[in-house]
Amino acid sequence: MSTPTTFRPVLERIAEEIERTPGSGRPADYIPALAARDPRRFGMAVAELDGTVYGVGDWREPFSAQSLTKVFTLALDLAREGDALWEHVGREPSGNPFNSLVQLEYENGIPRNPFINAGALVVTDRLHTRTGDAAGELLAFLRAESGNPDLGHDEEVAASEAAHGDRNAALAHFMASYGNIDNPVPVLLDQYFRQCSVAASCADLALATGFLARHGIRADGTRLLSRSRAKQINAVMLTCGTYDAAGDFAHRVGLPGKSGVGGGIIAVVPGHCTLCVWGPGLDERGNSVAGVAALDRFTTLTGLSVF
């Protein structure tokens, strides 16, 4: 098993291997503001439990966090309402595309898990009910955990998502018809699009995810979640965090992870460290091609895995 002092050469080796591989995958094109990203960009960061960060490539370049933010809104809402959340969203893999309407009808408006779009909308809705500003609460948390007060929303991305957000609107209206949404749908969608438009770097996001490696403890030493609830989030990340490719990701990488269509993936080694990798080129399931390859190499080279 690797020790933290060997992270830097491991990252450099991974970056060299990724650089030798021709850029593959395509940036998300259904959100026009993301489509222009160069699929050959690559960054990777590892954050130790004490906040020390190692990185390679474009690890300080901000990118659109997108679905990575779902991990943090889930944690913030669980910290407030606890297990009552699970009456409104499940914890099972969906096996369907992340923006699918099909299962919602079969399951009476209860999304399969908090990481598909329908589930994330429910979590954001409930957090907004409890805080009055879910997107603002998320941003404050990310700034505090990353130590970066300059983190913010990419307004171009938020506007682009709003202009092409009919599927998310349909999901929200459908769940509202079952009584599983509290806030007016336009209010919820504005919060959700702002949430997903957060721009952050690999360093920022690796640091922000640290509470999951510290079993619920924030960067300042205060407890956000019980050890049990931190375990729950890690478990749902492992089984549901990479859209309908979660089984393949677990097979290859062996860590709890969450991907986003901005090309980012965050991953957790409980008790050791957290990672964030970014490569805008996506595979057919919406996961970063370079990101999955880099995390695969990381766990192989270091022996750090939950298995």
UniProtKB/Swiss-Prot annotation:
One of its GO terms (biological process) is glutamate biosynthetic process. One of its GO terms (molecular function) is glutaminase activity. Coiled coil: none annotated. InterPro entries: Beta-lactam/transpept-like, Glutaminase. It catalyses: L-glutamine + H2O = L-glutamate + NH4(+). Pfam families: Glutaminase (PF04960). Keywords: Hydrolase. Substrate binds at S67, N117, E161, N168, Y192, Y243, V261. Its EC number is 3.5.1.2. PANTHER family: GLUTAMINASE. Belongs to the glutaminase family. Homotetramer. This is Glutaminase. It comes from Streptomyces coelicolor (strain ATCC BAA-471 / A3(2) / M145).
